[in-house]
Amino acid sequence: MAREPEEEETVRPAAVVRRCPRCPGWPGAPRPPLWLLCLVACWILGAVADADFSILDEAQVLASQMRRLAAEELGVVTMQRIFNSLVYTEKISNGESEVQQLAKKIREKFNRYLDVVNRNKQVVEASYTAHLTSPLTAIQDCCTIPPSMMEFDGNFNTNVSRTVSCDRLSTTVNSRAFNPGRDLNSVLADNLKSNPGIKWQYFSSEEGIFTVFPAHKFRCKGSYEHRSRPIYVSTVRPQSKHIVVILDHGASVTDTQLQIAKDAAQVILSAIDEHDKISVLTVADAVRTCSLDQCYKTYLSPATSETKRKMSTFVSSVKPSDSPTQHAVGFHRAFQLIRSTSNSTRFQANTDMVIIYLSAGITSKDSSEEDKKATLRVINEENGFLNNSVMILTYALMNDGVTGLKELAFLRDLAEQNSGKYGIPDRTALPVIKGSMMVLNQLSNLETTVGRFYTNLPNRMIDEAVFSLPFSDEMGDGLIMTVSKPCYFGNLLLGIVGVDVNLAYILEDVTYYQDSLASYTFLIDDKGYTLMHPSLTRPYLLSEPPLHTDIIHYENIPKFELVRQNILSLPLGSQIITVPVNSSLSWHINKLRETGKEAYNVSYAWKMVQDTSFILCIVVIQPEIPVKQLKNLNTVPSSKLLYHRLDLLGQPSACLHFKQLATLESPTVMLSAGSFSSPYEHLSQPETKRMVEHYTAYLSDNTRLIANPGLKFSVRNEVMATSHVTDEWMTQMEMSSLNTYIVRRYIATPNGVLRIYPGSLMDKAFDPTRRQWYLHAVANPGLISLTGPYLDVGGAGYVVTISHTIHSSSTQLSSGHTVAVMGIDFTLRYFYKVLMDLLPVCNQDGGNKIRCFIMEDRGYLVAHPTLVDPKGHAPLEQQHITHKEPLVANDILNHPNFVKKNLCNSFSDRTVQRSYKFNTSLVGDLTNLVHGSHCSKYRLTRIPGTNAFVGIVNETCDSLAFCACSMVDRLCLNCHRMEQNECECPCECPLEVNECTGNLTNAENRNPSCEVHQEPVTYTAIDPGLQDALQQCVNSRCNQRMESGDCFGVLDCEWCVVDSDGKTHLDKSYCAPQKECFGGIVGAKSPYVDDMGAIGDEVITLNMIKSAPVGPVAGGIMGCIMVLVLAVYAYRHQIHRRSHQHMSPLAAQEMSVRMSNLENDRDERDDDSHEDRGIISNTRFIAAVMERHVHSPERRRRYWGRSGTESDHGYSTMSPQEDSENPPCNNDPLSAGVDVGNHDDDLDLDTPPQTAALLSHKFHHYRPHHPTLHHSHHLQAAVTVHTVDAEC
């Protein structure tokens, strides 16, 4: 049944010749002691050779144990036999017809929202007609709405009134202004009732009234100007705007004036969106541009959130200059930027080009008229080259209430381009577009004045719906997008109507597309920006919008550029391209049917979604594996279907399985979102007892008479097919000798059906098909896949998963279509126990010199002495061989074709990820290749039939090996190059993007996009009263287990060996429940938030950042090397900085890692170094134990601050001991373990939700705190990033 992957080259180990070293004076040596030593050395080497030689046999022993676990404990063989016997229908997917159907479904969704927007627009326009005869001016102020009118609403995640709307007012509102809000109430309420996925609805009036429904009490801090928000601006002026802001900071500008100018520039930045292009210049004696991206010197950049953030940083850093202002130089540069941008892009006829000049208008005393004339000559000439299409807007900065008339006249002449007044002849007969001049002082409301700059631009009366890109819903969960339209009465603009739509609902058909394993789908907008792609996290779980990334970076394969051009230019079409296997994407490789070929075909079929700006595309990898769908099945008579909602069903035999509500009576079935026809509806609505009864009746119905409660067609057959495993699992629960080590057994199908035993209550958002155990099994079909260790969200501590695919038909020759994945969770310590029991060599010297380990095919350790060592090395997730065995890692990198270092681009956090892939086609074993590593011998071989390797290390003396790892985060130490044979921990580098074009730098353009990250898992909190009343399902009787072997690895038990100080050995070790001594330390804090122990913080961290104890000599050597490395680094860094004219916030940070703390930690351990040698490697290395934090806003900001062209020498630049200025919000269970508290500031927004998210530089991100525990655990260190202002 098992099939080996064929695509990897077979690796044969280097031949190792074992011979005794030539001994001095042998034979007949005059000095017997030396001869005797040599003999002993030979004998030791021979013994090691014999031990080493058995590694292949030992691997076979482990393989047979893995096969036994998969067959007997999990039931893989039985399940495969059952699936072989079932009847299937075959289906080949047709991209062209599929894309039409899917586009139609998405169009219908958008049409519902367009209908809502159009209905609201009609009501507003009709109300205005009524207003002319009977004024509508009644105001319901959001700031004074009584709390009694509102109640909490889960859809909005805040208190709202679903019957009335309320208003926010701008400072300039006339008391008789048109306000249709009260007329709108009934229509808006009806819309909300009849449309799932709808969020906030609003009307923004041109007179300054913002009406929002449902009503919500905002914390009001002064006036609210909605008309300078991007959604309003892009709806009333939908044409693209090319804007250059020039900021005068010459000698004549006072500090007060400069501050007004800087604030005004920030307002302009916050009013535009990614459809516009922007540049900010400062002018005094010379012109400066923002240096955070080299392209800003040459082109305008799309006003994405990233560009606006960089420009905002630049504006904030502007300082007064001592030199007089050269107005002409500033305008010359501004026109150059506009011209180069127009030349490099396809010119659109309706693009508005604007220069906004924030200046005091003062010219030099000596040559005032010449300065003015020179400035207007530049404007006249340069605008002539652009057919006089550029408008100039000037804002006069008043100096303490006084502004000279000459200065105002000059600024008016600039705005009106009065070159004739200065005797300058016109270059072209085309008329100029006259702008306007406005005066600004300290009392000016900048949002109402400068923020409304667009009113000077021509109103082309475009009455079309505008779709925003996704942004965070600051009041609720997830991402939203806005659909808006302008309202007119004749030619009079009344304002805009808008509706916020839940992105998860709009994209559900794309997110959960499951036609076949060989196909997937993506959605882009008409500019090529990606809204949804398989390598993006589900929108339901996103708290921040993905970076606006072009589809070309996700589909990074040769010839896709031509496909992209066709997708954007043709409303309907298809195209096939041939891709060499060595240029392929990882998610293509997993979908290939014939892995031996050098190339494969990819078929793209696309369709424009009618009435929107979005394009849907379906991708099929050819030749594809035909999809096999089960024919109608009947349920197994003996099996009882139990839905996982035990809390609703009132199960009499309920118990607690650690922290989960569970039952031992039968497995439970959970249907994840992908099982439903409308996944969003399932996720957003609470399940009721009645719904659960309907599901159960439908799924158990052999008569086929009960109506489908909204499930996909194939789900019932999958539920019935998986029910065959129930009897086997129940029998094993009674008979198996391993029950004390097994946490749970489960089986999942591609449509998201999960059957689990013991039957457990699961979180509604859980999707088994996106978990690592599932993805690993699918990537290794027919093999036993090992995943972990990871902290079990259900409360069982650290677990390791064995998973295996089940196929539609499986023969010795080939595995068919994957129809299910089975998995079983064991305790982490059980795996180490297996290693010790089955490989006596690991125990033969009490573990002093010989260490054994198991690692999976990415290099992460599944079993290793330090993972179970209570002294300073608590079990940790994501521990890599480079962390724990650097000497082995250094050596195996030199074996040809065995290990490959991979790069991929992660656009969710804008990083380049470096990882390892080990060749599972290894034949034989590997041993030391590099001469000179006499202190440490290792042997490594694959465990046949699995994705894992077993290794044995024999260390006879201290040796020094170095793998480059950051001490405090995941930053690579050298981001300039990656050598295949250089040892470094899995790490990440900033992804360098050219902000003006959205393209990556050339080197990174070749990297594939990373696959989707593992999603965080939450566990459903149960009623505390119920928790106290229920017994544990499994009682391990830890207190009755007297021997270490009887306690080690048993469910919920720990063998307590270390006292509560984290260092002292107990006089008498004993067995206790996990919460009493987690990790073997008495009183240690559990990583679970609700199991707080009594130990101080210094022990809880469990010395997570420590390396092994350093002896005096090795410590000295290490110190010297570190000093030398840092000295060279500092010297090169200094030289490098001088060679650059700009500084980046990252490259110029202080080198502020507190190495002293790390050294002190190491010294504390020195006392114990002898007694620790039994379990801990004496190899010296620097280890990073920071796991990747998938969506931390802090990490994103850290990387975003980079230039697209700057260098990075990569040593960490963060202070681990200081508090972050913007601590990331966090409800991780592990955070309790390292005592990093929650930082959810209670954010009650001053701005209504749908626009607040667009002011990202003003608001911290906030997500509500749910009583849930996340499962993707990350060690978090509070840090401060020392940024340096980007002076330009």
UniProtKB/Swiss-Prot annotation:
Residues 1159-1174 have a biased composition (Basic and acidic residues). Residues 242-457 form the VWFA domain. Keywords: Calcium, Calcium transport, Glycoprotein, Ion transport, Membrane, Repeat, Signal, Transmembrane, Transmembrane helix, Transport. Residues 50-1109 are extracellular. The chain crosses the membrane at residues 1110-1130. One of its GO terms (biological process) is calcium ion transport. One of its GO terms (cellular component) is membrane. Coiled coil: none annotated. The keyword Cell cycle does not apply. Residues 1131-1288 are cytoplasmic. Residues 467-546, 786-867 form the Cache domain. Residues 1-49 form the signal peptide. It is found in: Membrane. PROSITE patterns: VWFA. May regulate voltage-dependent calcium channels. Belongs to the calcium channel subunit alpha-2/delta family. This is VWFA and cache domain-containing protein 1. It comes from Mus musculus (Mouse).
